[in-house]
Regions:
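Catalytic phosphate/metal-binding cores of nucleic-acid and nucleotide-processing enzymes, i.e., regions
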Residues: 1-121
Length: 121
């Protein structure tokens, strides 16, 4: 395995292990080729793409995340970036980048869940 792939695998595994604390079904996804669906599986209706590179190509990576969100037919896409100098022991300090549209969708889902809960009370 190339050094670049090793770095990617290390970062993806760190994110999956961290998210498993909340979502037990989370796992690192294997490569899917042209129809990739993100690096992390198991978060309902969400694609997570993980990047661990020295230079940041956020615009390019966001386009990749969006393509993978569409491939997965998911509502949400999240790009997770390991900042330079922040190791896997501090994965909770890594960056999650989303579009404003994704934030709006999250708010809509929260409001919908809140209304559903209110109707049950």
């Amino acid at each position: 395995m190339s050094k670049s792939k090793q770095k990617g695998t290390l970062a993806e595994t760190a994110v999956a292990d961290y998210l498993k604390q909340t979502f037990s079904a989370v796992e690192r996804r294997t490569l899917s080729g042209a129809y990739d669906k993100g690096d992390i599986a198991g978060v309902p209706n969400c694609v997570i793409e993980v990047k661990n590179q020295r230079s940041y190509k956020i615009h390019e990576w966001m386009k990749e995340t969006e393509t993978e969100r569409v491939n997965a037919a998911a509502n949400l896409g999240v790009l997770v970036i390991k900042p330079n100098g922040v190791g896997v022991a501090n994965v909770d300090k890594w960056w999650a980048v989303v579009s404003l549209e994704t934030i709006r969708k999250l708010i809509e889902e929260l409001e919908s869940a809140k209304r559903l809960q209110s109707s049950r009370d």
